[in-house]
Amino acid sequence: MRFSNAFVLVAACISSVLADTKTFNFDLVNTRLAPDGFERDTVVINGEFPGTLVQVNKGDSVRIPVNNKLTSSTMRRSVSIHWHGFFQARTSGQDGPAFVNQCPQPPNTTFTYEFSVADESGTFWYHSHLSTQYCDGLRGAFVVYDPEDPLGHLYDVDDETTVITLAEWYHVLAPDINNEFFSSGIIPVQDSGLINGKGRFNGGPETPFAVVNVEQGKRYRFRVIAISCRPFFTFSVDNHNLTFMEADSVEHDPVEIQNVDIYAAQRVSVILNANQPVDNYWMRAPMTGGNPDRNPNLNISLTLAILRYKGAPEVEPTTVNVPGHKLLDQEMHPIAQEGPGKLGDGPPDKHITLNIAQPNAPFFDINGISYISPTVPVLLQILSGAKRPEDVLPSEQIFFVPKNSLIEVNIPGEGAHPFHLHGHNFDVVLASNDDTFNFVNPPRRDVYPINGGNTTFRFFTDNPGAWFLHCHIDWHLEAGLAIVFAEAPEDNVSGPQSQITPQDWLDLCPEYNAIEPEFQ
């Protein structure tokens, strides 16, 4: 026993020594890019799309100065950035959603995001969380590596070359699309789909597809991220099986599949065994969401990349897609079986039903109310003493939940909405395509689609903060499809889980409120 305790102490010391603070400088700029061959103005990090890949190790802290150099009067010039999938324990103010966790950062200023990834590892991403700004380009991948990954024996290669982003792309600027959306009530249709920032549209130039290089005999962990504003993708690689192992930064029992649906904001890790003849193979991610009849530029089947074996000629593949087994919710079981709070079918401490309706298109209601952003961030109101819904303005869509409680959320089916919960993972105890509850080993993730069926998930309130729950179709969020959980309000103010509030965060609201509307 003494040896065991000493070993644990030494391991903890080694882990502490290895932990580091990693700094990534983000220059937020307007530049003209043509990821699908059509040149347009963009809002991007460091002049590139997708944005800079952030790579750290489990236990590290992150420091990201954001230098807002936006100048274009045709797009939003203020900004906020969400670090999607991170719990932000004690740093709810760094989570990013505008008017939930912070005021937006004005142009010609620098704001530094600082947070610890603590015990988290896996596949994450980041994006603007101000209006629909990320549809203009502010989105990128974020990976936290675990040197002691319990599933690490399944793969040989896991680095920047195996991070794969899936996105849709618009030729029209997001503010203009917003105006069209709110005047017509019709969701905008994208012009093209991109893999790793490259794609094509009907009638456009034959821009080169992205190439993912592999070597025969090696196993590759592909971290596939849907950095989309609306559609979902069906990911596959011709002539190759895939082994699913991670969903939304949570590792699951390995399952052999041929393809997987990945909804907006979801992340999936799959292992590809490069065991086929040396050649070129299509990597496919056809989109669902957006009617091509309403945009002649769109060809959903042109969301392609090339898997190229070492030694293969530099030509496009001639392989053919053969549909196979698609990953099912019922096959997804986290390797850490313990869920949030109480396992088993015992009653939750609090049950919430969210009824979605759209009586006044394009606006959405939840329980009869459409979400409207407050002028003072919800978190700041909590830190100022708000303890009840009536203490928060506006109060209608703020749900106060007590600490250390099991919360069950039920969403009856209504349309296709990938819901994302900030600050937590949740257990999907009733999937939208099932009629049987699973309280033993349900899928665990932070984004799940409500696809016309009854969906129920559970989470445990062990992380005080202000946490958004919203549809990750950006146009639906803009139309009010959201609520906010105000978790353990008093514990945000004082105690061991109280919020860390840097001065530059406190300065954001006065700075933002002082600028003219055209700069907001």
Curated annotation (Swiss-Prot):
Its EC number is 1.10.3.2. It catalyses: 4 hydroquinone + O2 = 4 benzosemiquinone + 2 H2O. GO terms for cellular component: extracellular region. Cu cation 4 binds at H417, C471, H476. CDD domains: CuRO_1_Tv-LCC_like, CuRO_2_Tv-LCC_like, CuRO_3_Tv-LCC_like. Belongs to the multicopper oxidase family. This is Laccase-2. It comes from Agaricus bisporus (White button mushroom).
